[in-house]
From Swiss-Prot:
Its EC number is 1.2.1.41. The keyword Amino-acid biosynthesis applies. Pathway: Amino-acid biosynthesis; L-proline biosynthesis; L-glutamate 5-semialdehyde from L-glutamate: step 2/2. Catalyzes the NADPH-dependent reduction of L-glutamate 5-phosphate into L-glutamate 5-semialdehyde and phosphate. The product spontaneously undergoes cyclization to form 1-pyrroline-5-carboxylate. This is Gamma-glutamyl phosphate reductase. It catalyses: L-glutamate 5-semialdehyde + phosphate + NADP(+) = L-glutamyl 5-phosphate + NADPH + H(+). One of its GO terms (biological process) is L-proline biosynthetic process.
Length: 417
């Protein structure tokens, strides 16, 4: 089955690579319109997926990721339309010039070819990834989590109908609908057809891909994000940032999971934190230095377990640790961070600059929420993933991250001397 999908995707990629920006946008507009026109079938499929997932004990955080509503589906369709408005990087001349030999040389952006994406219970990813791949002239093979089988099947059927109505092959966007995990291992060895693989899931999936894949892999999406509250931070303003970073949408990978508090501000900061977190419904997981003081406040508090510093809660839970200074905070982030998004709240710009220079994450913030690490917020449009590695892309992966380049030399029957 996967062999045939690979063949179809590779053939489709050749046709997609020849499309003009106008032709690609016409396809995307058709997909957006059809997602809205056929919303009932997608929402019905999703309701069945959610019911099964709840019966099987899926966590509330994962159920939130899985669930579609009419408003969320309209938002997904609108995101596709936003991709239409983005500049098409394909065909862009990155640099070039005329060599001493007279050869005119340029470096031009081109599609990667076929992208493989493995992800969990995130039906929006199906459309986001498909739209970005189509905009950049790439075919895509999707493997969503078993919890989203019906939703993905309904969504991909709508996308394929839109492709065919525009004269393009359905093989441009395909989904593996068999939940058998053995197919993941088979997919990881499809280097004959897939040019780049993006796993969006937990640490176990990333480890599997790194160990078994014969395809270049871009990993990311695991967000153990930190905020360091420096001793010079403005408490009231800092709390606004922390509330946003923790509570706006707790199930996302750019949500803060650990708060590092400078010991010199702890006595005044912790009582205010407890009051604010109680109002926000957040459970605090406190270290020994913070526990007694937080227990005197209104927020729910438990003693932190050592392993929780490495946890991506994806829920209304927040670690709180007292640190001696900036060096201590940076050391903690280096040991427990996932190189996703980390922030410092401070009025000391020297400390801010040190934090920016010494924290090796894909996104580092000064006096701002970690929730900004998002393709839309960065002006990139919908994102295919957030890469936490350094090659071939880093941070939110927009359109340019789905391209490569080729060198083109134009001469007048020019030969090398």
């Amino acid at each position: 089955m996967l062999e045939q999908m690979g063949i179809a995707a590779k053939q489709a990629s050749y046709k997609l690579a020849q499309l003009s920006s106008r032709e690609k946008n016409r396809v995307l507009e058709k997909i957006a319109d059809e997602l809205e026109a056929q919303s009932e079938s997608i929402l019905n499929a999703n309701a069945q997926d959610v019911a099964d997932a709840r019966a099987n004990g899926l966590s509330e955080a994962m159920l939130d990721r899985l669930a579609l509503t009419p408003a969320r589906l309209k938002g997904i369709a609108d995101d596709v339309r936003q991709v239409c408005n983005l500049a098409d990087p394909v065909g862009q001349v990155i640099d070039g010039g005329v060599l001493d030999s007279g050869l005119r040389l340029e470096r031009r952006r081109v599609p990667l070819g076929v992208i493989g994406v493995i992800y969990e219970a995130r039906p929006n990813v199906t459309v986001d990834v498909a739209s970005l791949c189509l905009k950049t002239g790439n075919a895509v093979i999707l493997r969503g989590g078993k919890e989203t089988c019906r939703t993905n099947a309904a969504t991909v059927a709508v996308i394929q109908d839109a492709l065919k109505s525009c004269g393009l092959p359905a093989g441009a966007v395909q989904a593996i609908d068999n939940p058998d995990r053995a197919l993941v291992s088979e997919m990881l060895r499809m280097d004959k057809y897939i040019d780049m693989l993006i796993p969006r899931g937990g640490a176990g999936l990333h480890k599997l891909c790194r160990e078994q894949s014969t395809i270049p892999v871009i990993t990311g999406g695991i967000g153990v994000c930190h905020i360091y509250v420096d001793e010079s931070a403005e408490i009231a303003e800092a709390l606004k940032v922390i509330v946003n970073a923790k509570t706006q949408r707790p199930s996302t990978c750019n949500t803060v999971e650990t708060l590092l508090v400078n010991k010199n501000i702890a006595d005044s900061f912790l009582p205010a934190l407890s009051k604010q977190m109680a109002e926000s419904g957040v459970t605090l997981h406190a270290d020994a230095a913070a526990l007694a003081q937080l227990q005197a406040g209104p927020a729910k508090v438990v003693a932190v377990k050592a392993e929780e510093y490495d946890d991506e809660f994806l829920s209304l839970d927040l670690n709180v640790k007292i640190v001696s200074d900036l060096d201590d905070a940076i050391a903690h982030i280096r040991e427990h961070g996932t190189q996703h998004s980390d922030a410092i709240l401070t009025r000391d710009m020297r400390n801010a600059q040190r934090f920016v220079n010494e924290v090796d994450s894909s996104a580092v913030y000064v006096n701002a929420s970690t929730r900004f690490t998002d393709g839309g917020q960065f002006g990139l449009g919908a994102e295919v993933a957030v890469s936490t590695q350094k090659l071939h892309a880093r941070g939110p992966m927009g359109l340019e991250a789905l391209t490569t380049y080729k060198w083109i030399g134009i001469g007048d029957y020019t030969i090398r001397a």
